[in-house]
């Protein structure tokens, strides 16, 4: 009798995806973050579901309901902080996962990469709307500032913003719809993740060398299930350390003040994982220009496959582009820092220079260095 694992229509799919999947024998720990993102999504959906059982999406009671969750619900404080810090872990894993993809040229899997870019936008939208729900000061003003950016769209801007708000300002209608979207989006993300994996399994995984690994494949289980398990334990350790010892480390103190439309906080800023994009937005004096730069700062990932000029896929044997890559990473850290600073000298000019270098490295310098490296190796025609 053949193993049910290989014959049952449903179990067979799981088998081909997680058990008997042929995987390259040399993929490093940077390949662990895909499974960790899956874990983060599961944690967020489960904790979010339990939070939704006690949360009320009404402007008069939203803030109180979050307080109620933390004070009165059994382990409510744990669920709330796991959800809040789980979002931070999600983005840490996302940034590393994308960084790995750029470094090792995984963007040449066009379908997988494009679904990944869509996933990034979906996760960012979900996180933004989730931040509005506690209805603290930063929730309210963050929602006001970010939704207001759409008013920069010519002709339809103002109407569009009021349509999203469901009124003439961020109010009850806005909070209710944000809660509805925040609840449904993670399930759409889960569906997109399946499509992401579907496309990945059409080609098989990339590996650090960027070379074809068909001649040397090993089964996913037990090798990579065990390897992923180590990542899982480390992620949970890191998350729970954050939750149990420093729950408010990454949050904003302003969000412990209930939303007040009559009192603007001195420094409106988003969560840390949006600061790099926020810095790019602020570095352009023109409103529409800033919005376009903001969108392009993420959308630029979709152009990655077309900006690849080298005959080598990975950066493993490309020292010049390696230097540019790490300059880009440092640049993003600078942008993240600037995004959290007030709009004054010298932060404005630093932000503008960092924004220019961000786009320059990706659009100009990296493609040029790819051509130079090919010439040095006498590979160019």
Swiss-Prot record:
A ubiquinone binds at residue 201. The chain crosses the membrane at residues 33-53, 77-98, 113-133, 178-198, 226-246, 288-308, 320-340, 347-367. It comes from the Eukaryota. Keywords: Electron transport, Heme, Iron, Membrane, Metal-binding, Mitochondrion, Mitochondrion inner membrane, Respiratory chain, Transmembrane, Transmembrane helix, Transport, Ubiquinone. GO terms for biological process: mitochondrial electron transport, ubiquinol to cytochrome c. Heme b b566 binds at residues 97, 196. InterPro entries: Cyt_b/b6_C (IPR005798), Cyt_b/b6_C_sf (IPR036150), Cyt_b/b6_N (IPR005797), Cytb/b6-like_sf (IPR027387), Cytochrome_b (IPR030689), Cytochrome_b_C_euk/bac (IPR048260), Cytochrome_b_N_euk/bac (IPR048259), Di-haem_cyt_TM (IPR016174). PROSITE patterns: CYTB_CTER, CYTB_NTER. Heme b b562 binds at residues 83, 182. Pfam families: Cytochrom_B_C, Cytochrome_B. Its cofactor is heme b. One of its GO terms (cellular component) is mitochondrial inner membrane. It is found in: Mitochondrion inner membrane. CDD domains: cytochrome_b_C, Cytochrome_b_N. Binds 2 heme b groups non-covalently. GO terms for molecular function: metal ion binding; ubiquinol-cytochrome-c reductase activity. It is a multi-pass membrane protein. The cytochrome bc1 complex contains 11 subunits: 3 respiratory subunits (MT-CYB, CYC1 and UQCRFS1), 2 core proteins (UQCRC1 and UQCRC2) and 6 low-molecular weight proteins (UQCRH/QCR6, UQCRB/QCR7, UQCRQ/QCR8, UQCR10/QCR9, UQCR11/QCR10 and a cleavage product of UQCRFS1). This cytochrome bc1 complex then forms a dimer. Component of the ubiquinol-cytochrome c reductase complex (complex III or cytochrome b-c1 complex) that is part of the mitochondrial respiratory chain. The b-c1 complex mediates electron transfer from ubiquinol to cytochrome c. Contributes to the generation of a proton gradient across the mitochondrial membrane that is then used for ATP synthesis. Belongs to the cytochrome b family. Heme 1 (or BL or b562) is low-potential and absorbs at about 562 nm, and heme 2 (or BH or b566) is high-potential and absorbs at about 566 nm. This is Cytochrome b. It comes from Apomys insignis.
